[in-house]
Each structure stands twice: as C-alpha cells, then as structure tokens.
Amino acid sequence: MSACPAPRSPVRWLHAFTLFLLLAVLAGCVSVPKPMAGAGEDVFSRVGRFAITVTESDGKQQAVQGGFAWRDDGGSYLLDLTNPLGSTEARVEGRPGMAVLTRANGERLAAEHPDALAEDALGSPVPVTGLRDWLRGRLMAGAAPDGLERDAQGRPTAFEQDGWNARLSRYDAQGPQLLVLQRQEPGRRILVRLVITQP
C-alpha cells in the first residue's frame, strides 16, 4: 500500500469517502457508462447521486454530495466520482489483487483489496466489496447478515452486514435504486444515501 496522510478529521473523512463513492462509489451531469472492453453478460452499470452525512457525538454534522458512475464486469470495476457540478473528482479501478484510486490532482493510492484501500484512505472500514453486491440487490458473500428482511419477490430490503445497517428499495431489473447505509462508530454516526438516476 502506498502512504496516505494520517488521522482524519470529519471533514477530511467525508472528503476521502466522497472519493470512493459512492459509494458511488458518485450529479446528474454524468453520462451513461459505456460497457467495459471485453465485457460479457455480467456487465453491470449504475449512475446516480450520493449524499454522506457524518454526525459527531456532540451533534455537529458534516455533509457532502455528488455523483457516481459504476461499471462492473464481475471481475473488475470502474467507479468515477463527480462533484455536484459534474467535474470528475476521482476514479477507482479494481480487479482481483489490485485496487487503485486516482484523484483529480493525479495522486494515486493502491492496495491489494478495495476494502484495504478504503480503510487506508479513510482510517475507517468501508464496505467497498459489500457495495458491489448491494448495488445488485445481493447480500455480501462471507458475512452473515443480521435482521434480514425481504420483499415479496425475495429481494433483500433491510439487513445489517459487516457493521453497516442497509436498507434497499425501489428495485428495478438490475437492483435497488435507493440504498441507505448507516454505521455507528465511537463518537460518530455515518449515513450514506445512494440514489440511482440511470440504469
């Protein structure tokens, strides 16, 4: 892993998390993602908006929002993140054994696993791997969910997995169009809201 600046204030944490999202992982100025070269039936793409709010134990809140375009062929993925004006802030590229974050200023961070990359950049665990599944309306493999609720079609609508309380709704053929993720950490609560605007 490459070096990353140390401990993060809520504002720095929000800024760094924004670069990952989401999410998306993430406004409406983002174009429809093009299929990845050599992609087959497993091609999955989503375009949308995100909002992240961190509430400190003293009641102070920090919030950021923007857009995302997620393209995933099952083996690798590409996540472009934009600010509210539509300018690209970062790109995250992942494939087995490698995850790379490239910021608009050219700075790059790399790790063997996307969750490790996120934790290195943010100083806090982020479910990048889980997000790949949750965007498709699936539970993350290898982590048993608590409090699992399903809709009439058997799709997950509420659960807790890997420390995140997730609510998925407004399903279309690809998955949920609204994801609300919450995590309680010592001294703060993190709320992530993803809204899909284009399939």
Swiss-Prot record:
Q: Does the keyword Protein transport apply?
A: yes
Q: Where is the signal peptide?
A: 1-28
Primary localization: membrane
Which GO terms of type biological process are on file?
A: lipoprotein localization to outer membrane; protein transport
RNA-binding as a keyword of this entry, yes or no, is no
Highest rank taxon of the organism: Bacteria
One Gene Ontology CC term in the entry: cell outer membrane
Lipid moiety-binding region (N-palmitoyl cysteine):
C29
- Lipid-bearing positions (S-diacylglycerol cysteine): C29
List localization entries: Cell outer membrane
Q: How does it sit in the membrane?
A: Lipid-anchor
Database matches in CDD domains: LolB
Entry keywords, A to Z: Cell outer membrane, Chaperone, Lipoprotein, Membrane, Palmitate, Protein transport, Signal, Transport
Family, per entry? Belongs to the LolB family.
Record HAMAP family: LolB (MF_00233)
Q: Tell me, what does this protein do in biology?
A: Plays a critical role in the incorporation of lipoproteins in the outer membrane after they are released by the LolA protein.
Tell me, how does this one assemble?
Answer: Monomer.
UniProt name for this protein: Outer-membrane lipoprotein LolB
